[in-house]
Regions:
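Short beta-strand and strand-turn-strand segments in soluble, beta-rich domains
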Residues: 14-17, 58-75
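Short proline/glycine- and polar residue-rich coil/turn motifs
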Residues: 74-85
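Beta-sandwich strand segments
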Residues: 45-46, 110-121
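Short, surface-exposed ligand- or partner-binding patches at beta-edge/loop junctions that are enriched
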Residues: 98-108
Length: 131
């Protein structure tokens, strides 16, 4: 997926995330994570069309090795600047045990909100074979 580059101001598409910590998950399982996402940018997020806004996840091993990135939760309705929406993200845990970083990001206009060098809202997750 592309990151926003070029002429779009950084503040046009921006988000804040609130969620409970995920510390330990089972390798290969599907998990639903509930989180609140606030539109802290200046543009409304559209929930319809080919480039509608969606919540995505990025799984990293170490600090920079991207394992996967997936769109995990569509918006139930358009989200105006300043508005908060509650989402249920369906995530797929990596198949191999280890320590991962799970980062959250929104996508709109067919591009991720974050730019290279931005800090994503992330959490460290231990992936194990069994609980």
């Amino acid at each position: 997926m592309r990151r926003f580059h070029g002429n779009r101001p950084k503040t046009q598409y921006h988000a804040a995330y609130a969620l409970s910590p995920l510390r330990r998950l089972v390798a290969g399982e599907a998990v639903t994570v509930k989180l609140r996402v606030t539109n802290t940018g200046t543009a409304a997020w559209n929930n319809a069309g080919p480039c509608a806004a969606v919540l995505g996840d990025h799984w990293y091993q170490g600090r920079t090795r991207l394992v996967s990135e997936t769109e995990v939760a569509p918006l139930p309705a358009p989200v105006s600047p300043g508005q908060t929406v509650e989402l249920a993200a369906s995530i797929s845990v990596p198949d191999r045990p280890g320590t991962y970083t799970l980062a959250w990001d929104m996508r709109a206009q067919c591009e991720w909100f974050t730019k290279p060098g931005d800090v994503l809202r992330s959490q460290r997750v231990e992936v194990v074979y069994t609980r």
